[in-house]
Every structure is written in C-alpha cells, then in structure tokens.
C-alpha cells in the first residue's frame, strides 16, 4: 500500500514571470500525479498539494531549485491526492486574498515591514516574560472567524471576518485601537495570512506585532496539546479538521443541540449550503441539517 502525504508551504519573493512559474508548477504536478491548490503572484507562491510520498518529496526538491524558493518552510501532514478534487494552479494578484495588493512590499528576504517572527518556543518565552512584568500578550486570530469555532489560542481575539477580504475593514473600524500599544501575536494555519496581516497592522499603527512562525501547524507539531492551543485545526480540504494528539479538546458545539463536535457540514438547503457545526446525530437528518435560525439565502 502506497504511503501518501500532504505538504503545505508558501514563499514571499519577487516573481518576474508568474505565468511561467504557473506552467512549470502544473507540468511538475501532473508528471508526479499530485493534486491540490497552488496560487502564484508577482509576490510569491502559496501551495498545498498531496500524493504518494516519493512523488511529493520529488516535488518539494524540484520546487526548491527555483531561486526564490530555496528556503521555503514545508509542513507535512497525513493525507494524499484523494483529499483534493483536482489540481488547480492559478496566477492571481495576491497569493492570499486580503484585497490589498498595493499595500504589500516584498523583496528577496520576504515581506518588508511585517511582524517579528517567533518560533513556538519563542512565543512561550514572550508570553512568560510579559507575564512576569505584569503585562500580557494578546493573541490575534488571522483566520476566518468560523475556523476559531473548533480551535484557537486561549483567550484569543477573533475578528468578525467571513473571509480575508474583511480584515482591512475590520482593522480600520477602530475596534482594535486599544491593542495598538500592546504586544500582539498574530497566528493562522500555516503562517501565510499573518505575513500580510501583521504588515497591515504595522501600517495602521500597531506598535508591537509578532507572527507565529510556521503557524498553528508548526506550533502543534512542537507542543501538541500541551501548550496554549485548544481544540482542532480547520483545514481547507476533504479532511476538514485535524488534531495534534489524542488529548485534543473538542471545543466546537453543534448549532442544533450544543453537543461537542469539530465537524462542519453544509446546510441541507440546496440554495444555502452554509458551512456550520453539526453533531453526527443532527447531521444525519435533512430536517436538522439546516440553519436553526433560518437560511440567509
């Protein structure tokens, strides 16, 4: 039986010809039998691909041969090509869609003017040091708000955003101005959203901004469920969520009966299909697999 794996990585680096990189990446993945999603822009690459482990290793090795991708931090997880419906390789204005391509500055070293990178151990050191001085680090979730329903850092601020496009409006709303003089640690799944988010926050006057290097994925690999993270990690493929150990808490609640769950399901109304948390019992019936307050659609 073949051993399969999924890799997640990104790299911010100037790309003179994004379309040429797109063609190369598509040809490489097709040759190796990989599926997944790859986004390329003038500012870099954002990729999640899966397949047979030998093919994935060859893909990573070949991708790193591109000048700007030598130092990409690759995160490995269980899964394979079957977790993605197809291979998608696209060129876009941004490799993560905040709707602010003009605000981001990228050079050979990555994003210019973003937050200070902290490895998981360094994050703990910062939290402890501030605690000793009577201060506290504010955790700021850089994901879509619904993702935090099943997992987040303890006492984290979770902005009211449906997509990353909503972050600029949210930051400009004034809701978080009281945090501008506090140490703020941004976090997201693999680190890419915080590369941009931390830069946007610095641009808006947040004085001490950090970003979790490698994101929740790297933190979970380091501390499992013995650190400051609680719950499951939402992922954008057929797996839907993953846990870092058997000791993971289930913090999500079914919208119908409040039973603990980490499983998102689409509303059974064909014109709605909103992704919502349901327990197995409520998800088993079309009558209960519906938005309890009525569908917005």
Swiss-Prot record:
NCBIfam families recorded: PRK00142.1-2 (NF001134)
Active-site residues (renumbered): 188
Xref: Pfam families: Rhodanese (PF00581), Rhodanese_C (PF12368), UPF0176_N (PF17773)
EC number(s) recorded for this UniProt protein: 1.14.-.-
Gene3D superfamilies per record: 3.30.70.100, Rhodanese-like domain (3.40.250.10)
Matches recorded under CDD domains: RHOD_YceA
A GO BP entry: tRNA modification
Listed name of the protein: tRNA uridine(34) hydroxylase
Organism of provenance: Pseudarthrobacter chlorophenolicus (strain ATCC 700700 / DSM 12829 / CIP 107037 / JCM 12360 / KCTC 9906 / NCIMB 13794 / A6) (Arthrobacter chlorophenolicus)
Record's keyword terms, sorted: Oxidoreductase, tRNA processing
InterPro entries in the cross-refs: Rhodanese-like_dom, Rhodanese-like_dom_sf, Rhodanese_C, TrhO, TRHO_N
Molecular functions (GO terms): oxidoreductase activity, acting on paired donors, with incorporation or reduction of molecular oxygen
Catalytic activity of the protein: uridine(34) in tRNA + AH2 + O2 = 5-hydroxyuridine(34) in tRNA + A + H2O
Protein's job: Catalyzes oxygen-dependent 5-hydroxyuridine (ho5U) modification at position 34 in tRNAs.
SUPFAM superfamilies listed in its UniProt record: Rhodanese/Cell cycle control phosphatase (SSF52821)
Domain Rhodanese, residue spans: 133-228
Family: Belongs to the TrhO family.
């Amino acid at each position: 039986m073949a051993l399969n794996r999924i890799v997640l990585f990104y790299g911010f680096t100037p790309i003179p010809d994004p379309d040429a990189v797109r063609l190369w990446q598509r040809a490489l993945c097709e040759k190796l039998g990989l599926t997944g999603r790859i986004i390329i822009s003038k500012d870099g690459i954002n990729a999640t691909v899966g397949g047979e482990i030998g093919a994935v290793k060859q893909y990573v090795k070949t991708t790193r041969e591109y000048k700007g991708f030598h130092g990409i931090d690759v995160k490995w997880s269980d899964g394979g090509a079957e977790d993605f419906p197809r291979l998608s390789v696209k060129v876009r204005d941004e490799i993560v869609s905040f709707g602010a391509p003009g605000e981001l500055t990228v050079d050979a070293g990555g994003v210019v003017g973003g937050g200070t990178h902290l490895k998981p151990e360094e994050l703990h050191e910062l939290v402890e040091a501030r605690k000793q001085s009577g201060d506290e680090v504010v955790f700021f979730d850089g994901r879509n708000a619904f993702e935090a329903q099943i997992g987040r850092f303890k006492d984290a601020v979770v902005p009211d955003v449906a997509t990353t496009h909503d972050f600029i409006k949210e930051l400009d709303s004034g809701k978080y101005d009281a945090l501008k003089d506090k140490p703020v640690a941004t976090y997201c799944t693999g680190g890419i959203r915080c590369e941009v988010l931390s830069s946007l926050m610095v641009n808006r006057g947040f004085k001490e901004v950090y970003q979790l290097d490698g994101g929740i994925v790297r933190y979970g690999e380091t501390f499992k469920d013995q650190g400051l993270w609680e719950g499951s990690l939402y992922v954008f493929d057929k797996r839907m969520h993953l846990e870092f150990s058997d000791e993971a808490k289930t913090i999500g609640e079914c919208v119908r009966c409040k039973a603990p769950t980490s499983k998102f399901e689409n509303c059974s109304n064909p014109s709605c299909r909103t992704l919502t948390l349901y327990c197995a019992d409520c998800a088993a019936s079309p009558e209960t697999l519906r938005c309890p307050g009525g569908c917005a659609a």
